[in-house]
Amino acid sequence: MSNSKEIPSFRWTQSLRRELSSFTIPVKSDVLKDAKMIADGLDFSQVALVQRVLRKTKRTDGDLDKLRDLNREVDNLMAMKSAQKNTILKLGDLNKSELMDLASDLEKLKKKVGQTERSPVGGVYLGNLSQSQLSKRTDLLRRLGFQQPQVRSTGVVRIWDVADPTRLNNQFGSVPALTIACMTVQGGDTMGNVVQALTSLGLLYTVKFPNLADLEKLAAEHDCLQIITKDESAINISGYNFSLSAAVKAGATFLDGGNMLETIKVTPDNFSTIIKTVLGVKKRENMFIDERPGNRNPYENLLYKLCLSGEGWPYIGSRSQVKGRSWENTTVDLSLKPTQGPKAPEKVGLNVRLSHLTEIQESVVREAMSKINPSHTTWIDIEGTSNDPVELALYQPESGNYILCYRKPHDEKGFKNGSRHSHGMLLKDLESAQPGLLSYIIGLLPQDMVLTAQGSDDIKRLLDTHGRKDLKVVDVKLSSDQARNYEEQVWSDFGHLCKKHNGVVVPKKKKDKDPSQSTEPHCALLDCLMFQSVIDGQPPQIKLQSLLPEVLLFTMKPAFAI
């Protein structure tokens, strides 16, 4: 998987700075105007109160109200802010490939953020729980004692125990004007000294990410930096805390010639151009969404901030009055014309059989395929080779709908090898597989649809064989261990959906003789369920529904032979 690579974070940052320089503008004077307005107009006794709230181990709806009220006061005092501007990007704003790339990355970002906010890392609770999870947790804490450590940790478990977790959205994150005002007023220093100190941090940021060792050296020259906390930043406790990242961001706003990402201003007129430029840099630098829970890499951070609001200051403006998340406020319209693609014949000379269905059978298949929503995540997987597939599965996790069909192989020797080492299907079980069904299904996939796969090469070859070059395949690139993480549970819960994998699977001999190799057969449908389970962190929780009737999958067998 891509996230196994070492991420060259600062190189990515420099590349993004260079390519997006035309969208940056000098902001020092505007930031200082807002900082002075906050320093003069904000009640800092309320700031101190909210800072105490953020240090509490358990925070309630009342505490959240205090934070939201103070954020509203700050927003009212500022000129630099992001506006609620929901954007739908369509063909014309970006080309087809860019739209699909953006849609895929926003979906991955959504899943990453969700996993991060639910992962207790380093003893610090990192986010929101559902109401049912809150209830279970409350009962658990009552029975076990709140202060008892639940995980090995030297940190403090910080909990937002609120009825509506969506009220937490966009209430955190640092704002340079606020950081400067708080350092000035609460640090008892002059704003001029604070600006000089933060400028030094900003200059250092042009060549590296400043760390705590750098901070210690600079604090010897700028006493006002002593206020910066040495604690590691965590999700949902920032905003009014004096973190190093907040100070660095503030320092970046003072560098007019540094092409800093922090000084980007987004407008409805330049939004799609900025996104297009970002996707271009991503492609050249091989950037990606690292789906492991944790801090965002530079590309993820920029994409999240840009897509949160289509108008304003993505990094440094007040965002507390913006509702929704990035993947909600910026959406991609991939289904302007969800017309079905042509039923293209296979190319001559390849080992894919073409057989015709009856009109009634075609009508049933068309009815089933009409229930495939082109805007939903759609997994695709096959067993067999791309030019001689024996099983095809499509699965949409949002609805639980799936398509599963079979095909008699042309290459029996290759099939038996695949059966022994992979799918465990038996030739006798596929003798009566409905001819032409697999090809007809591929031909009915909606035009320009985005498909999700674990390993895309064979899928792309299969689609190309059927003349479906319009279809986009997104490869999640899970490691082999990750992909099979839910294998046992998925087979236990859903094995009854696929009864054609009855052979014995023997792992291929390898030099390292890995004892962990699975002997479970590979089923196209169950593999799709496993891959989605890895992303969700649990097996499917909804009822699965086959869109094709069982009677259509195989030809009728005679009751007796003459």
From Swiss-Prot:
Residues annotated to bind Mn(2+): 381, 383, 527
Site (Important for exonuclease activity) residue list: 458
Domain of life: Viruses
Main location: virion
Biological process annotations from GO: negative stranded viral RNA replication; RNA-templated viral transcription; symbiont-mediated suppression of host cytoplasmic pattern recognition receptor signaling pathway via inhibition of IKBKE activity
InterPro entries: Nucleocapsid_arenaviridae (IPR000229), Nucleocapsid_C_arenaviridae (IPR035084), Nucleocapsid_C_sf (IPR038115), Nucleocapsid_N_arenaviridae (IPR035083)
Single annotated GO MF: hydrolase activity
UniProtKB keywords: Capsid protein, Helical capsid protein, Host cytoplasm, Host-virus interaction, Hydrolase, Inhibition of host IKBKE by virus, Inhibition of host innate immune response by virus, Inhibition of host RLR pathway by virus, Interferon antiviral system evasion, Manganese, Metal-binding, Ribonucleoprotein, RNA-binding, Viral immunoevasion, Viral nucleoprotein, Virion, Zinc
Role according to the record: Encapsidates the genome, protecting it from nucleases. The encapsidated genomic RNA is termed the nucleocapsid (NC). Serves as template for viral transcription and replication. The increased presence of protein N in host cell does not seem to trigger the switch from transcription to replication as observed in other negative strain RNA viruses.
Protein name: Nucleoprotein
Species whose genome carries this gene: Chapare mammarenavirus (isolate Human/Bolivia/810419/2003)
Name of the gene this protein is made from: N
